[in-house]
Design a protein with these regions (language model features):
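An alpha-helical appendage that flanks or caps ligand/catalytic pockets
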Residues: 104-138, 180-301
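Alpha-helix-loop-beta-strand connector modules within alpha/beta enzyme cores
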Residues: 42-62, 66, 121, 325-338
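Short, acidic/polar
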Residues: 10-21, 75, 153-161, 289-298
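Active-site mouth loops of central-metabolism enzymes
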Residues: 1-12, 62-69, 143-154, 210-213, ...
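Hydrophobic faces of well-ordered beta-strands that scaffold small-molecule active sites
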Residues: 1-6, 29-31, 56-60, 87-91, ...
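N-terminal beta1-alpha1-beta2 module of alpha/beta enzyme domains
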Residues: 1-59, 147
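Glycine-rich, proline-tolerant flexible connector loops at the mouths of alpha/beta enzymes
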Residues: 28-51, 63, 95-98, 174-177, ...
C-alpha cells in the first residue's frame, strides 16, 4: 500500500518537508494547488524533487480552470523530467482555488474534456485547437515516462470519468468503509455501463484525515479543520448522498449550506464546529495505532491501494502535527510494508 503525505506548498520549508517525508518512508508527497492561499504548487514541487531521490510528487489537487490543459500538461511533464519519473498529476473539479476567484467547480462534462485533452498532450499527441495543430513538441526530445493522471472524486459522475479516462482514481469520501466500498462499486459499474474496452482498471486511492494519538478526542480536534474541508464536498449542492449514513445527513446539510469560505481549513469555523466527535470518528482514521491499523486494513481489503494522509496542519498545531506525522510513520507504515 502506498502512503502519501498531504501538504501545503510553502517555499520556506518545502525541501525540509519533502526530505522528511522520504526519510520517514512515505511513498509520495502531494501539495495543494490553491493560488490565493499558498505558494505556487509547481515551483514548490520542483524544489521538492531536487531535495529527494525516490519520493513521488504531484499536486493534490489541481483543477481544469486556472490553467489551460497545455499549461498543466507542460508543468507536470517538466516535473516528471526534473524528478526523473516521479510525477503524478492529481486533479479534481476545483474548490478553494476556484471560489477564491469567484468560480464554482467545473461541470462533469468540462472536467472530462479537460482530462481527455491532458491525456493527448501527455502522450505526445496533437489536437486541433481553434484550427491550430497543438502539441507539446518539446516532449519529443525527452525520455519521459508518461505521467499518470489521478482523478480526485466524490460523486458517481466524476468517479465514472476517472474510471474511463485515467490511470488512478482517489476517493474524497472519508474513511467510512461502506462509503468507500460504494465508490469502488461505482468504478466497476462505470466500466460495465460504458460498453468500452479499457486496457486496465485504474488503481484506487483515498484522501483520508488521519491522526495517530493515544487520546482519541484530542485526535478528533487535530483533524477537525481537514475533515471540515473534505466533508463539505459531500455537502455541496447537487452532491449524491444516496450512499451516506443517515445519521450524518444533517451534518452534511450544514456543511453544504453554512460553509465559511473565509475560514476555509480552520477548526474554529462555524461549519467545522457543527461536526460531532462521532461524525469525525466515522469520517477519519483517529486514535491509538491498533485502532488506526484495524480501520486501514478494512479499507485496504475493499481494494484501496493508496492513501493520501491528511494529518494535522503544522501551521495550526505546531509540534503536535509533527508528532502525528512521525507516529504514523513509526506505528502504521511498517505494518503495511512487504
Amino acid at each position: 500500500m502506498e502512503f502519501w503525505h498531504f501538504g501545503v506548498p510553502s517555499i520556506k520549508n518545502i525541501e525540509v518537508m519533502a526530505k522528511k517525508c522520504e526519510d520517514l518512508d512515505f511513498n509520495g508527497l502531494t501539495l495543494t494547488d490553491s493560488q490565493n492561499l499558498s505558494n505556487e504548487t509547481y515551483i514548490a514541487l520542483t524544489l521538492a524533487a531536487r531535495a529527494t531521490t525516490k519520493l513521488m510528487l504531484g499536486p493534490g489537487v489541481t483543477n481544469p480552470l486556472t490553467r489551460h490543459a497545455a499549461v498543466t500538461a507542460s508543468a507536470i511533464a517538466t516535473l516528471q523530467e526534473v524528478s526523473e519519473g516521479r510525477a503524478i498529476l492529481g486533479i479534481g473539479r476545483g474548490d478553494s482555488s476556484l471560489f477564491n476567484i469567484g468560480h464554482k467547480p467545473v461541470p462533469p462534462r468540462v472536467f472530462q474534456t479537460y482530462i481527455e485533452t491532458l491525456q493527448i498532450y501527455l502522450n505526445g499527441g496533437s489536437l486541433k485547437a481553434n484550427g491550430y495543430e497543438s502539441q507539446l513538441k518539446w516532449l519529443e526530445n525527452t525520455n519521459n515516462k508518461k505521467v499518470p493522471i489521478d482523478v480526485a472524486a466524490t460523486g458517481p459522475k466524476i468517479i465514472g470519468v476517472g474510471a474511463m479516462t485515467s490511470e488512478r482514481v482517489s476517493f474524497a469520501l472519508g474513511a467510512d468503509v461502506d462509503r468507500l466500498a460504494w465508490g469502488v462499486s461505482q468504478i466497476e459499474q462505470s466500466i460495465l455501463d460504458s460498453n468500452q474496452m479499457i486496457s486496465s482498471k485504474p488503481s484506487l486511492g483515498a484522501y483520508l484525515n488521519i491522526c495517530v494519538h493515544d487520546d482519541i478526542e484530542r485526535a478528533a480536534e487535530l483533524v477537525r479543520p481537514g475533515v471540515g474541508i473534505f466533508a463539505h464536498f459531500t455537502g455541496m449542492s447537487g452532491a449524491n448522498r444516496d450512499h451516506v449514513n443517515q445519521a450524518d445527513q444533517s451534518t452534511f446539510d450544514k456543511l453544504g449550506s453554512n460553509y465559511d469560505k473565509h475560514r476555509h481549513g480552520r477548526g474554529d469555523a462555524t461549519h467545522a464546529q457543527e461536526m460531532s466527535f462521532e461524525f469525525i470518528d466515522r469520517f477519519s482514521v483517529i486514535g491509538p495505532p491498533e485502532v488506526c491499523i484495524k480501520k486501514i486494513n478494512a479499507i485496504k481489503a475493499i481494494g484501496i491501494e493508496r492513501i493520501s494522509v491528511i494529518g494535522p496542519r503544522p501551521d495550526h498545531f505546531g509540534a503536535e502535527a509533527d508528532q502525528a506525522q512521525e507516529r504514523f510513520a513509526a506505528d502504521i507504515i511498517p505494518t503495511f510494508r512487504g
